[in-house]
């Protein structure tokens, strides 16, 4: 597996869990901004050894790079309407953090572990889910939650 394939695997996982949300890669130039719900996948860093384990296969040296890739997942949501009081005023509740924590719970599930085994990867939480909601133009909120994950896999060269 290479970096591109690893990112595609993570993209597949996010579309599996966040059904109905647009999943996009972060740091894309000239990309059209999607309407919420949106999941943004960003690669933070890639670490691998300078001198990987190497073996001879059919007379040729083959190197295996154990690779750790840190990924950031940002979830943007519209929130959920909440009716309060008899006047039926509608408020909007921030659901981004709750949704991200549900994803973090999914990462610990038996289904998820089996999915990772099939893909020959390991995926672990690197941080707690964080509420990163922002006030925009003093008029509206952009509901957002962030989570960092560590994906481990082997590159063959």
Question: At which residue positions do the language-model features occur?
Answer:
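Short, structured beta-strand-loop surface elements
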Residues: 88, 92-93
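Short amphipathic alpha-helices in soluble, non-transmembrane regions
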Residues: 99-107
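Oligomerization/assembly interface segments of phage tail-like spikes and tubes
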Residues: 63-87, 103, 142-153
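Winged helix-turn-helix DNA-binding recognition segment
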Residues: 94-98
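Sterically constrained small-residue positions within well-ordered secondary structures
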Residues: 32, 62-64, 138-140
């Amino acid at each position: 597996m290479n970096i591109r394939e690893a990112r595609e695997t993570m993209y597949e996982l996010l579309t599996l869990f966040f059904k109905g949300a647009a999943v996009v890669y972060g740091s894309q130039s000239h990309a059209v901004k999607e309407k919420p719900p949106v999941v943004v996948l960003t690669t933070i860093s890639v670490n691998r050894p300078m001198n990987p384990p190497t073996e001879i296969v059919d007379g040729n040296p083959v190197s295996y790079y154990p690779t750790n890739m840190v990924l950031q997942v940002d979830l943007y949501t519209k929130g959920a309407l909440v009716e309060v009081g008899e006047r039926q005023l509608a408020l909007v509740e921030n659901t981004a953090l709750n949704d991200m924590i549900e994803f973090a719970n999914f990462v610990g599930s038996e289904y998820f572990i089996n999915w990772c085994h099939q893909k020959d990867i390991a995926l672990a939480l690197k941080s707690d889910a964080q509420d990163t909601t922002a006030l925009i133009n003093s008029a509206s909120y952009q509901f957002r939650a962030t989570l960092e994950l560590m994906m481990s896999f082997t590159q063959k060269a």
